[in-house]
A protein has these predicted regions:
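A short linear hydrophobic-aromatic micro-motif
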Residues: 34-40, 74
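Short amphipathic alpha-helical patches
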Residues: 49-52, 73, 84-88
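Short S/T/G/P-rich N-terminal loop/turn motif that feeds into the first structured element of a domain
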Residues: 1-31, 43, 80-88
Length: 88
């Protein structure tokens, strides 16, 4: 299944907002069994969330965001994961 990185602008995101967004995301995922949220990273300094998802298509990622009421700035499909251990 393709893997995607999603960039979201969320300036001024409070802990309560983050909790609500996470709950909406999980609820949307419950209706979309082919979409899987892997993890997210938050940059308070930039007002961004960077999310990692597995999904059958870019359209499925957009549909999840729509159902969850989440912004999407950019979606990038990634196809190779590397780590420092690979080069030792």
């Amino acid at each position: 299944m393709p893997r995607y990185l999603i960039e979201r602008s969320v300036p001024g995101l409070s802990p309560e907002d983050l909790n609500a967004a996470g709950r909406r995301s999980v609820a949307a995922l419950a209706t979309m069994p082919d979409v899987r949220w892997i993890r997210s990273y938050i940059s308070d300094a930039e007002g961004k969330i960077f999310c990692e998802y597995d999904a059958p298509s870019v359209e499925a990622v957009h549909e999840h965001a729509r159902r969850a009421g989440l912004p999407v700035d950019r979606i990038t499909e990634v196809n190779l994961e590397i780590s420092p251990e690979m080069f030792v």
